[in-house]
Amino acid sequence: MSTFKIKVANFFARQSCAAWQPNRIIRAICRQLYRFIMETDAKEYPYADLKFANWPESDGDFYTLVTDSSGFVIRRSTSYVAWLMKKYCGNSPKLPKPWTRKPGEHRFDAKHWGEILEYNGWQKVSRAEWPSYRDIFDERHFIGIITDTDEFGLLVWFNNAGFNITGSPVIWLVSTYKDFKEQNLEIPVSEKSGIIWYREPKVKDI
C-alpha cells in the first residue's frame, strides 16, 4: 500500500480512538473510513504494515486500540483468522448477540472463540476427525484454538499436514498472528498440543 494511503488511513484511525477524539459519532465514521481504505481489494491480511496505527496500544482510559471490520483488534490472531475466514470461506465471523464478555475478556481474546465459531456453524471435531493432508485436497478449512498460550490464547489456521510412511499425520502446518507478525508454525499432532479444532460448516449444515 502506498505511503499516501497509509497516512490517510492513519489520520482516520487516530480519530477513531477515544484517546484523541471524544465525539463518538465522529469516531464511528472514521472507523468505517480507515477500514475501507485498508481492506478494499486487499489480497493479503491488510493490517500487516507496521506503519499503520504505529502508536502505543492502550485499552485503558487513554484508549488507542484499532479494530478491523469484524471488530477485532488488529495484528492479533483473532483479526488474522477472521480475515482468512472472509478470504477462503466467503464471510467474516458474526458475533453472538448479545455479545456477553467474560470477566477480564477483551476483543482480541482467542481462548473464548469456541462460541463464536459454533455461532457461525463451525463444528468442534473429535480426534478421529482432526485435520489431515486429505482435507487440503477436499478444500476443508479448520481453525484451531490453543487456550493456554499466553494470556489471551491463540488461533491458528490449518494449512497442511506432514505425515509418516503409513500416511498418518505427525505435524500440523498452521499460520497465525503472534508477536504482531504473521507466523507459520509446525505443531506436533498430539493431544498434548492442546489444540481444539473446529471445521467449517458443510453447505448442508449452513
Which residues make up each language-model segment?
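N-terminal capping segments
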Residues: 7, 11-12, 17, 26-114
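Compositionally biased, intrinsically disordered low-complexity segments
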Residues: 9-11, 28-32, 119, 128, ...
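Aromatic- and glycine-rich peptidoglycan recognition patches
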Residues: 45-47, 57-60, 151-206
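Hydrophobic beta-strand residues in large extracellular and virion-surface proteins
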Residues: 81, 85, 144, 156, ...
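...with weaker cross-activation on analogous glycine-rich loops/strands in unrelated enzymes
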Residues: 101-175
